[in-house]
Amino acid sequence: MSASPSIRPTAGIAPPLLDLRIARKLYGDRTILSDIALQVARGEIVCVVGPSGCGKSTLLRIVAGLDPDFRGSVTLDGSALAGPSARVGVIFQEPRLLPWLSIADNVGFASGARGGRDPSVERLLDEVGLAGVARQLPATLSGGMAQRAAIARGLFGEPDLLLLDEPFSAVDAITRMRLQTLLLDVVHRHRMAAIVVTHDLDEALYLGDRVLMLAPNPGRVDDEIQVDVARPRDRRDPSLAAQRARLIDAFQRFHDRAAGDPAGIPITSA
């Protein structure tokens, strides 16, 4: 399937908050991303999936202002972004909490204040269920609690856009599902937009209003799925099965092409 020239917000959602244009992104002589045009509306969650090495994390770094060396533009609410911005929150695969600071000081790190009581930090910790551990150090938290602290830190300063790079891949299945539901709650409550990079197809279909499939060599949008399933979603909803099969077929195609085997070995058994 050929790349889409422009990926628009889901029908019925407000005008775009984010307008991303990547004509080309190079690493040395290799083209990592090419011909990407993506718009995301406020209140919308877009999930990005694709095989390893297709440029998913690079795309997030560009939007976050951490990788300015590309041909194109990033516009947020009509204003060009040329570097990191308080209007864009980032949540990584690992919590990356500073071990010598309390949970509260980690969440409010960008403010520069330490040791005091910040009402906005206290509100965020309460929102993610960590009000009782504000003065504890990161080493005392479970993996799921640490990632909730990272979500609170990403929300500090009331960003308009939240970027998440495989945020729940390092926790167990039940914790992952709880964190996914927490993410949906905070995106809805704060009326922000979110882009989630994930390798988990079920996670993408549960979280996303849209799912973008990136093809590799170079990274480009190969397919877009509108997830027209009402929220709150049931993870067992059979209407998600056909969309999941479509994503699996795309992954099989990419892997077979990379291996030089057009027939390939089926992912599912007969």
From Swiss-Prot:
Q: Where in the cell is it found?
A: Cell inner membrane
- What Enzyme Commission number(s) does the record list for this chain? 7.6.2.14
Catalysed transformations (reactions): ATP + H2O + aliphatic sulfonate-[sulfonate-binding protein]Side 1 = ADP + phosphate + aliphatic sulfonateSide 2 + [sulfonate-binding protein]Side 1
Give the membrane topology, semicolon-separated if more than one: Peripheral membrane protein
Q: Which UniProt keywords apply?
A: ATP-binding, Cell inner membrane, Cell membrane, Membrane, Nucleotide-binding, Translocase, Transport
- Endpoints of the signal sequence: none
The UniProt entry, under SUPFAM superfamilies, shows:
P-loop containing nucleoside triphosphate hydrolases
List, alphabetically, the GO terms of the cellular component aspect.
plasma membrane
* Molecular function terms from GO: ATP binding; ATP hydrolysis activity
Q: Which residues form the ABC transporter domain?
A: 17-241
Q: What CDD domains does this protein map onto?
A: ABC_NrtD_SsuB_transporters (cd03293)
User: Known Pfam families for this protein?
Assistant: ABC_tran (PF00005)
Q: Where is it mainly found?
A: membrane
List of residues binding ATP: 50-57
Classification via InterPro entries:
AAA+_ATPase, ABC_transporter-like_ATP-bd, ABC_transporter-like_CS, ABC_transporter_ATP-bind, P-loop_NTPase
Family, as annotated: Belongs to the ABC transporter superfamily. Aliphatic sulfonates importer (TC 3.A.1.17.2) family.
Subunit info here reads: The complex is composed of two ATP-binding proteins (SsuB), two transmembrane proteins (SsuC) and a solute-binding protein (SsuA).
Annotated function: Part of the ABC transporter complex SsuABC involved in aliphatic sulfonates import. Responsible for energy coupling to the transport system.
What name appears for this protein in its UniProt entry? Aliphatic sulfonates import ATP-binding protein SsuB 2
Q: Which organism is it from?
A: Burkholderia cenocepacia (strain HI2424)
Gene name of this polypeptide: ssuB2
